[in-house]
Amino acid sequence: MKTFGRVLTAMVTSFNNDGSVNIENCVAIANHLLDNGSDGLVVCGTTGENPTMSRDEKLALFNAIAKECGHKGSIIANVGSNDTMASAEFVKEVSKIDGIDGLLVVVPYYNKPNQQGQYLHFKTIAEATTLPIMVYNVPSRVGTGIFPTTLVQLHNEYPHICAIKEASGNLMIASEIKRLMPGDDFMVYSGDDGLTLPMLSIGGCGVVSVVSHIAGKDMNAMIQAYESGHNYKAIRIHQALSEIIKAMFITTNPIPVKYAARKIGLPVGKFNLPMCEPTADEEAYIDKALAEYLK
């Protein structure tokens, strides 16, 4: 199966004290991730605090990372919003950038469209680009989710809608997607670090990861072990990752991972409100799980 890679890191964004994006620091973070287990990056996603970034900042960051880091791995630009026409126009701009390998498009949030509305949303965006599209299904943040049957219809009509970041937490949804589309032309990525190994067992091809900021090599090794038939090795790595995975989601993402990335020396900068620093208790929990990675 031709994929974007096994481990795609949903990378944090480095902000200056005034809240603007620090492009130089972001490129440094991207290079670090691609040198330490990540096969690709998702830029300006949830972990990247994209709601606090302007359109121009996103375009500048896509350009910089594609130019400086695109030779090292896949670059996926997050372009989704809950405004279909605005998303389609943004997609046209992003599609002009050399080195962008694909687009992440979330199910529209807050306005909670039904399945027909979701179909029309993705149809409109697909007609605005020829780049591969990864649908992002995350009902916990969106308030609704895309059905496997809707996804099949979209893929059949627009084959470049060819992947999903499945973050519902429900493995039966991923299983149904693979039952309906068993071939190699549709990629299912786990959107939950802790479900990566079980997702592989039902036909998934990798993970869009947060934990890979800290343990990218281990995450990639787990997937490679499974793919090579070394199931017990994969299970051991999965179990060894459990504490850092729990720590990275002790509170709302990206609060823990940005704190942890700073602790390992990455120039992540400040949070932009409404994201903020973890509490003292949360810091202590993260520090305990992180200790092994600071040796």
PLM features: what roles do these ranges have?
Residues 36, 60, 64-69, 93-97, ...:
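Alpha-helical structural signal in soluble globular domains
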Residues 73-74, 133, 162, 185, ...:
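Secondary-structure boundary/capping signal
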